[in-house]
Amino acid sequence: MVSLKIKKILLLVSLLNAIEAYSNDTIYSTSYNNGIESTPSYSTSAISSTGSSNKENAITSSSETTTMAGQYGESGSTTIMDEQETGTSSQYISVTTTTQTSDTMSSVKKSTEIATPSSSIVPTPLQSYSDESQISQTLSHNPKSVAESDSDTTSSESSSSVIISTSDSSAVPREISPIITTDSQISKEEGTLAQTSSISETTRIAQMVTRVSQISSITAASTIDGFSSESTQTDFSNTVSFENSVEEEYAMSKSQLSESYSSSSTVYSGGESTADKTSSSPITSFSSSYSQTTSTETSESSRVAVGVSRPSSITQTTSIDSFSMSEVELSTYYDLSAGNYPDQELIVDRPATSSTAETSSEASQGVSRESNTFAVSSISTTNFIVSSASDTVVSTSSTNTVPYSSVHSTFVHATSSSTYISSSLYSSPSLSASVSSHFGVAPFPSAYISFSSVPVAVSSTYTSSPSASVVVPSAYASSPSVPVAVSSTYTSSPSAPAAISSTYTSSPSAPVAVSSTYTSSPSAPAAISSTYTSSPSAPVAVSSTYTSSPSAPAAISSTYTSSPSAPVAVSSTYTSSPSAPVAISSTYTSSPSVPVAVSSTYTSSPSAPAAISSTYTSSPSAPVAVSSTYTSSPSAPAAISSTYTSSPSVPVAVSSTYTSSPSAPAAISSTYTSSPSVPVAVSSTYTSSPSAPAAISSTYTSSPSAPVAVSSTYTSSPSAPAAISSTYTSSPSAPVAVSSTYTSSPSAPAAISSTYTSSPSAPVAVSSTYTSSPSALVVLSSTSTSSPYDIVYSPSTFAAISSGYTPSPSASVAMSSTSSSSPYDIVYSLSSSASRSSIATYEFSPSPSTSLPTSSTYTYFSSAYAFEFSSERYSTTSTIAPTQIHSTLSRITDFLLQTSMAIQSIVSQQISTSSTLNDEIHSSALSVFNPSASNLVETSLIISSTQASITSPKNSAKISSLQSQLSSSTKNPYDTANKNTETSGRSTVVSNFLYTSSAAKPDNEKFSATPTEITTISSSSHAYSLSIPSSHNSVTGLSHNFVDSSKSATSFGYSSSSISSIKLSKETIPASKSVSNTQERITSFTSTLRANSQSEKSEGRNSVGSLQSSHISSNPSLSTNTKVDSKSLSRKVSKTMGENGEETGLTTTKTQYKSSSETSGSYSRSFTKISIGPATTAVQTQASTNSVFTAPALSTYPTTPYPSPNSYAWLPTAIIVESSETGPTTASFNPSITGSLPNAIEPAVAVSEPINHTLITIGFTAALNYVFLVQNPLSSAQIFNFLPLVLKYPFSNTSSELDNSIGELSTFILSYRSGSSTTTLSPKSISSLSVVKKKKNQQKKNATKSTEDLHPPQVDTSSIAVKKIVPMVDSSKAYIVSVAEVYFPTEAVTYLQQLILDENSTLYSNPQTPLRSLAGLIDSGIPLGGLTLYGSGDGGYVPSLTSSSVLDSSKGNSQNIDGTYKYGALDDFINSFTDSASAGKYAVKIIIFLIVLTIGVLLWLFVAFFAFRHRNILLKRHPRNCIGKSLNNERELESTELSRSSSGNQVYNEKPPESENESVYSAVDDHYIVTGENTVYNTIHRLHYTINDDGDLLYRDAIPLDFDQTNGDDGSGIDSIVRDCVYDKNQDATEAFLNDEESISGILDVDENGDIRLYDSYSDNEESNSFHLPDEVIENYNKNHLCETKLHGLGTESCTTDDPDTGNQITNEFSTGSQTCLPSTAYTTPLHTNSIKLHTLRYTESSLPKPNQTLFSNLEDLEIEDIDDNGSVSDVHIEELDALDEELYKRMSKVIKQQNHQTTKI
């Protein structure tokens, strides 16, 4: 338990440190009208509705049973019992579980819907009542009490008021609608900041309610085979007319909890609930109640669904004529986990008096199909918008229909099928509305929509027909025999539009006349006209006129005449000077026989015009090499025209370079004519001036037999638009390959139009790339008119066109196309082949006299953001309000997203779906246009989304049940800013959604965004999905009701109040993390209209255990009586929260019981939200908003991104270090590894030593070891660039220096790559640290002097630079240390050393996270100035330098009071060398001790060896024995075990002379007789023994004196035999134990010294000599266990003995298999009786079985041979009793002989 608590405390400290880290790094500010963020990671909501009619009805439901312990499981069951089939019940359960790791977040939604047939009609008379509710709430925090226990919150509610109170001392009253809020907080030890604010606004309106509802039949059916299911539901028809008296209130609460953990759950009057987990952030809640006016509500719904391979979606349409509702919930917080987010509610208005009927059907087949049919009434027009948006495309379409027109659209998807059919729409004739909206989305966080003020009008018309020419104004006509007339107009100038007109006429047999006019000057239009006439048999006449000067137009005319047989005469006139025109005339004459080589140089002066005339003549047999250089004056434009004519047999290579003056535009025209047999390769580069636009026109004419390859690059000026027109004409037999690149200026839009005309027999391959400017839109417009035969290309050609568009970060590209239809039907087919095929077909069938203009806008982004991406965008806008629009997007991942949206006023919704492999990403964005409100609301949202995987049910269910499951959706944090301005005009809400992307998988990064869900407006709205039991897919269907309140006339009173309080305190209290909350709420509401009654009872219990922290908030249900005569509701909710540090367990059980009578109906909703937050996950958000409340932090750091100059743009600012998972690069100390590494890492540019600088050394920890730096150049580059900034920061004494330092870094980037060898330091990867702290060495812990009291020296830090990085091998470290050599100011080295050794110095508190992270990686054990002290002159290093060599800095301070060091931190290191003598003394002592210890061990081993050897010699000898073989050989001594506790057990065996199979007898059974309790007598030794608890025999006394008398008087008694055989006079005193009063005196002879006399010989007839042993001798003998004998095989109890040598137990087993010991009462007659004869005792057989022979089979046999009396005996017991044992062995044989002799006599 102690270790478990320690783990919990460490986990809590880690979490609080992570909170501190982000609190110190970022300032978050917001106000009550700012955005919403709420992320409970687990939420459960249940909605149940029950109605009955006139009969008893019992319902038992167990809506949810959830168990969560590491994984998630859910089960639900419902039991319905109806006595009559007149009741209906439906239940909706939604459970959302969200789990977030460092990078991913998954979400699962499930819902279950069970329906039974029922029908009831409930008319209710007019009701009138008034209700007012107030709430009083206290919300504060006491830092001292938080650590001891959490705030206990209790609430009570009645019909008049709701009171919420806490145990805190401060309170803020409020007056709002009923809201129940529960907060629990956990505080850290540092302190708490509490802040509370409230604003109350109240509006009261009287209300009247009248409602008539009819619930139709609901049926559900499903088949068990899994291939088909059918569900038909006819929902309710509801008509409501009512007036409400509703309070409209706004309340905001804000609580700033510094270093605290807060969990709150709130239920609002509108039925919504939120749950927040906050940390170091303000919590703001803002809500408003809804208002209703007199209206009529009619709702009809019909649902039909048939599914084969995938489930079907049921859609519902509800129309409400007049209804309004407004509810806003705001919560701003900083969360440690992700979860649910508030919903966005739409406000829609439109004129009333309309009825809608719609029928929708869906069928799933092998191919997905969707069909929508709209029928419009006679005088109505339709206006609607459907916007389907993804990361790249936004489309908006507008359709105008006429009376009795219909629109039919079909979408065909190759991989899935889905068809939707919607019925006609009927509308009143007086309804009309029109609106158009445009949305642009860019895949960048900082993107925004920018509409340029410069008009760009581009119009093109194409007409193609192979056999007939079509004369159309503004059209192209191309045929083999008819020329083509083309006219185009471009407008591009910001201040003066430019009119450009071009006409091209092409024919094989007719000359081509081209006329162009360009106008480009900002202040004076320029008229430029060019005419080109080309013919194979006629000369070409070209005339050009250019006007380009800003103040004086220039007239330039050129004429070229070319002929194969005649020379070319060229006359040119140029006017270029601003004040004086310059006339330049040039004539070129070519002769077939004389080559001309001409080189000319032109120089124009600013003040004098130059007239230059040149003549070139080339011959057909020699090439002409022409080199020209033109230099224009700075103040005058230059107009240059050149013409090159080559001979028929020699190609001409021409290279030209033009340089324009900075202040004047340049007009350049070039014409190239090549020979029929040689191709011409032309390369041109044009550079325009920065201040004037450039108009450039080029024409290329190719010969019939050779292709022309042209490559052009255009660069426009930054301040003026460019109008560029190009025309390409290819020969009939050769293809033309054209590649163009356009770059637009950053401040002006560019209008680009391209026309390609292909010959009938050759294909055209065109590739174009467009790059837009960052701040302007590029509008591309194309218009096509088709012939009645619908032929676009000629029959024998194909066109392969590939286009890629790359938008700027802040602008989108809008392409608009407009089509006008002929009287016939037109079919447009769009086919795209990618990872999947999608075909969209539109069919328009208007009346013969109707025009159907359609406008579509497509916004494309770069294909780099869409890998394997395909999406469709459909958007239409009409002039009446449609009823329903369905959009279906199907993908290969078996995911069907079906969205149904009812648009009564002007509402657009953007839906997009993209897929990669099996990942689904879908997004949705909303915008609202409200024309009838009283104020102007502007809303902007920032949405970030994370993709969630799809779960599909795969198990079959019952046939009678209908299960529906919601597909997973993405959760989005919102940041909303609202600005309300009261006005008398219209109200417009514009929502711009800017998307940021999040990757679901590392390999497939996509971006998408979608709100959590669409807010349901009225009670008839549902959010559901249908899943067939055997299906493998899931479908989501959403239905919306949009209502109108334009006819509502309400008057309201307004009042507001604001109260705020701030309390700041700081305490140091140990952190606690235990929460126990019990909330009890009893709600009663009684309204009596009739004598009927209804009761409802529900109870819920929640218990949760979490690894880090668990919070449960349970809110009572909010009940509303609609049609009830009498109602009594009682509900009690108790909440208990527990915590388990090892597991996470969640158990939720809900039980509801309800009984009702008479006609009644009720509707209840209950919400339970449970938040479980991870302990170590932190997300950093940097934002800056103009807000009212600013959250203070303990340490304030800049939060604005820093500019990124070009010098560091390529270098990531996230510090790259080696991941801790991979471990150090070198596992152990291996100095030889440096042989394969470079000697140093140097920068690209060598660093020279500045003046007054010293070369110091900075070492780094293992995260930046040398091997890692060699393998990761970016990491070493960060040291070269960022380490000087780290060292400069403590010496920056002015704000400008700090700002300059800050400006040198780019924006900090959060990045983390798990599992890789390289990671980046970011708040995510170091979330367990409050700030990036260093690993402190022992030296830093002992530091006594802080650098806070010191003042940094005033030095110039601009020259600090890193010279190189070198390796250093340290035997105490398992890696190669990286040491950076830095040039540092000499006078500041001492102060820098103090900063490094002080853990609280400013060096480690850099406000920039990258620099602070790098400072935390500095190893303070590496000295600054001593690594090169004992090395070579070039900076060699001490090879075994360790951090321990650097002594305590306090010692250095005591020795150097003035604060100066000679060698910096190496002073103590140098001093350690001077103390080497004292250190050597200790080493000598240790060596001497080791030598003495070794010698002692060797001596001990030597003595033990000789003792063991002596023992083995004694064992080899055979001991003498007095025991002889029996004369009759009847019994042989098999074994005798003598046990002595001091030396272990020894077993001796004497083998009989017979074979081993013969029967043997144990001497133990023959010679031991039980004489009493725990006593035994030995008949051989004639000794009396006592048996102890271990089974050992202790010597007791000898045989009684009268024992020999029973054997006769011949003097041959046993005592005399024992005395004569066993003892002699020289024997030492025998130790024995005599506990009997009867001593056998006279048997043993004891001398005056107490010694026993033993005699060597005896006589059979000699009388026994009595002798006596002293008691102390015998007692001492027994104490030493020198006479213990253990008997085996006696008794019936289990007896075991431990073998001290082997550690095993030796068990004496007998043949019967049982274990026996000596019994306590085996014999009743004691041995002391005189009636027992010796021979009788000897031959008395024991009743116990003989020992098993196998017991001794594994024991070592010891042969006892006959020995004489004079032989020596070697005893195996090397003890002090050797003499006694020897005598016993000598006398044993004599005893046996005497015994046998007595037996023979008898």
UniProtKB/Swiss-Prot annotation:
Residues 1507-1802 are cytoplasmic. Residues 453-788 are annotated as: 12 X 28 AA tandem repeats of S-[AV]-[P]-V-A-V-S-S-T-Y-T-S-S-P-S-A-P-A-A-I-S-S-T-Y-T-S-S-P. It comes from the Eukaryota. Residues 54-81, 113-143, 970-984, 1071-1123 have a biased composition (Polar residues). Residues 1-21 form the signal peptide. It is a single-pass type I membrane protein. Residues 22-1485 are extracellular. GO terms for biological process: (1->3)-beta-D-glucan biosynthetic process; cellular bud site selection; fungal-type cell wall organization; hyperosmotic response; osmosensory signaling pathway via Sho1 osmosensor; signal transduction involved in filamentous growth. It is found in: Cell membrane. InterPro entries: MSB2. Sequence repeats lie at residues 453-480, 481-508, 509-536, 537-564, 565-592, 593-620, 621-648, 649-676, 677-704, 705-732, 733-760, 761-788. Induction: Expression is highly increased during spheroplast regeneration. One of its GO terms (molecular function) is osmosensor activity. Glycans are attached at residues 24, 1252, 1293, 1342, 1400. Belongs to the HKR1/MSB2 family. This is Signaling mucin HKR1.
